[in-house]
A protein has these predicted regions:
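Mature catalytic domains of secreted/periplasmic carbohydrate-active enzymes
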Residues: 1-189, 197-198
Length: 200
């Protein structure tokens, strides 16, 4: 921010300390080799339709990485060599900080669209929820956060890929290719309900 150039910071010491105490996964892109997170490229909580986790190490880039930042999105690369989680930042109100003219939360429709266009595109949503001038959340904002969370839970409580008593048939998955033609990575793995299996 303003005046920051007047202070000399030992950023490398910060990075080393955070890395030692917290590991690789909590430093944002300017953490150099220790970075595990990158900014999505906008402050609207929106990720590109095709967002990749990997980025490319680039010694010529300002922060050491080419994150394919274009059109307001950090898109990443399918063939990148460094995994950087694409963090989608957004505000629940019109501003990052609370104010008497910035205390109306977004609608549940807007928040839902934001969720599906961030998390649904492979980027965790970091939703800023500012406290008021008393250090508490305004009731309208707190209610909105609770309702938003409940809407997400309700949206996914019925696994639409499973058969049910009403006659819904279980989903199947097929793919034109599988890694090394190995069925251990077959398309059916996207539907087996296990967190440690996958299709590739």
């Amino acid at each position: 921010g303003s005046g920051a150039n007047a202070q000399v910071y030992d950023f490398q010491r910060w990075y080393n300390t955070i890395h030692e105490l917290e590991g690789d996964d909590c430093q944002i892109f300017q953490g150099g080799d220790f970075a595990g997170i990158r900014w999505i490229g906008n402050e609207n909580g929106l990720a590109h339709d095709t967002t990749w986790g990997p980025c490319k190490t680039d010694k010529n880039a300002k922060d050491g990485f080419n994150t394919n930042l274009s059109g307001g999105y950090s898109k990443g690369f399918p063939d990148g060599d460094k995994w950087l989680v694409p963090e989608a930042d957004a505000r629940i109100t019109s501003g990052w900080f609370w104010g008497t003219t910035k205390n109306t939360p977004k609608t549940l429709t807007d928040l839902g669209n934001m969720y599906f266009q961030s998390v649904g595109h492979g980027a965790p949503l970091l939703l800023n929820v500012p406290p008021n001038n008393k250090g508490k959340l305004d009731p309208a904002i707190a209610d909105c956060v609770r309702e938003f969370g409940q809407n997400i839970k309700d949206s996914f409580k019925d696994d639409l890929t499973r058969a049910n008593k009403s006659g819904r048939v279980a989903a199947t998955a097929e793919a034109s290719s599988t890694w090394n033609d190995n069925e251990a990575y077959g398309a059916s793995k996207v539907l087996d309900g296990k967190d440690d299996t996958y299709w590739c």
